[in-house]
A protein has these predicted regions:
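Conserved, mostly hydrophobic/aromatic
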Residues: 52, 115, 169
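Active-site-adjacent "subsite" loops/lids of carbohydrate-active enzymes
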Residues: 58-100
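A short, well-structured beta->alpha microelement
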Residues: 7-22, 154, 285-292
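The substrate-binding groove and active-site-proximal loops of carbohydrate-active enzymes
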Residues: 26-32, 81-94, 126-130, 185-191, ...
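Active-site groove signature of glycoside hydrolases
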Residues: 95-126
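Aromatic-lined carbohydrate-recognition surfaces of secreted/lumenal glycan-active proteins
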Residues: 136-162, 173, 210-220
Length: 292
């Protein structure tokens, strides 16, 4: 079993602009939105790997490569996220995804990728499930052929995981205990039956395939206590936790919880001609340094 074989990495996901990389460097893996211009080499020397978020079976019109996707490959729409669902069955699709989505990011220095929307073909009114899954497998196999050493985190894709041994670094799933209802725009507790089903899927991935499992849950950003409690429940189940807000725009709680270390000190410049002789510096420097 994976959990017994090695220590699981600490993982964080942050999708908005201006990710606080200096704070997130305590995690082993940080998934970011690569279009926001991050340097993937920024934290590698410090032991933190930036993974690029990529959407496999959905694409938003704002993506640069959207205009190059043939109309006949567009099989449905996801109204909640204003995205188009991409058919995975065309023979040219794996090369398209490798060339136009992953290759530019690889050239920038990314070596890890978070593959999202693996089961979005189910949003279409008609689809051949086996053919769609075969297409997803071809995408991942093509990535390994084109980019030796690539590291992939797959969001769901439980059915194809046994066919991808050695090619998937981690399998993720959202909403184990707490989720975000995009249609109703609210945070919700996951129903027991759904939770039990998802736990069974993740445990199978870990025990049968030896792939670590990451559970991503969503809690209102002001409710830190609930986020902390949820992360502990996920970790107690044997999975890597990440609990954050619905927009993935805050530093959440995972295997690690970041402790704030920045203090704003206000002082009166008329007290002293030099900052190091001001009262806040004289009386606060030592205890603040002691606190880290």
């Amino acid at each position: 079993k994976y959990a017994q074989a090695k220590k699981a990495p600490a993982v964080a996901l942050y999708y908005q602009h201006n990710a606080p990389l200096e704070d997130l460097k305590v995690f082993d893996i940080v998934v970011v939105e690569p279009d926001h211009g991050y340097d993937p080499l920024a934290l590698r020397a410090k032991g933190t790997e930036l993974y690029a978020y990529t959407s496999v079976a959905e694409v938003q019109p704002t993506r640069a490569y959207f205009k190059n996707i043939p109309a006949q490959w567009q099989m449905a729409r996801n109204g909640h996220w204003n995205s188009v669902v991409v058919d995975q069955t065309p023979a040219q699709w794996p090369a398209f995804f490798a060339d136009q989505v992953v290759a530019p990011l690889w050239q920038r220095g990314y070596r890890g990728f978070f593959l999202d929307t693996m089961d979005s073909y189910r949003l279409a009114s008609r689809f051949d499930e086996a053919a769609q899954q075969d297409g997803l497998v071809r995408v991942i196999e093509t990535l390994h052929e084109r980019f030796p050493g690539i590291q992939l985190i797959m969001n769901r894709g439980f059915e194809i995981a046994p066919r991808l041994k050695g090619k998937i670094h981690m399998v993720a799933a959202e909403s184990l205990y707490r989720g975000w209802n995009a249609g109703a725009s609210r945070y919700e507790e996951v129903p027991l039956a759904d939770r039990q089903w998802l736990i069974a899927q993740l445990k199978t991935i870990q025990d049968r395939d030896g792939i670590p499992a990451l559970a991503i849950d969503y809690v209102a950003p002001h409710d830190r206590a609930l986020a902390r409690e949820t992360a502990k429940r996920i970790e107690a189940d044997g999975f890597i936790p990440w609990v954050t807000d619905s927009r993935l725009s805050t530093v959440g709680v995972g295997t690690l919880e970041l402790v704030p270390r920045r203090i704003l000190v206000v002082y009166n410049s008329s007290e002293s001609p030099a900052l190091n002789y001001s009262n806040p510096h004289r009386y606060a420097q030592m205890p603040l340094n002691h606190m880290g």
